[in-house]
Amino acid sequence: MWDSAVTIIAIFLAAILMFVFPLMTMADKSDDVSQLSIQNATTDFTNKIRTTGYLSQDDYDNFILTLASTGNSYDAEITIQKLDQNPAKKSSGDTTTIGQNVYYTMYTTQVLEQLPLSLNEGDIVSVNVENTNTTVAGQLRNFMYKVTGNTSGNIVAQESGIVTKTTAN
């Protein structure tokens, strides 16, 4: 009887070592590739906006298609802080600033409604991307770590920067 119990436990452990851990490793590598792809796409998208000072519907659509190409679903949030400068004319030849420069914020829905959008030098662009589905690696981690209470990580990318060039579009 004791030998049967040990044999069953050994078979169970062998199955875990031979099938579950390699599956978890491959799923984690898939998530790593998705993370790298999403981070690169987010960086490229943000840098294009920063260096051109312009955001078009085609640029946004291409970004969303790149995100979707990983096989996951994502929530992409765009935040643009537009610089509202406050120059005042003191006399005909003298320009001074009265008060402070203020940024006003546009969020994703406002940005998408105003496409194409031209930005000015000094505006701030932020793009945050987070997956909305649970990946295979996340499901396996949740199953394996259910006892310990660990949660699975998300695929997240963040990028921001200041617009350095203004286009005349």
Residue ranges, per PLM feature:
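Short amphipathic secondary-structure patches
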Residues: 48-117
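Glycine-rich, aromatic-bearing surface loops/beta-hairpins
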Residues: 126-169
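Envelope-exposed proteins and targeting segments
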Residues: 121-125
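A sequence-composition feature that detects small, non-aromatic residues
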Residues: 5, 10, 14-15, 27, ...
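Residue-level signal for the start and early helices of compact helical domains
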Residues: 21, 67-69, 154
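Alpha-helical assembly-interface signal, strongest on the long, hydrophobic N-terminal helix that forms
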Residues: 2-65
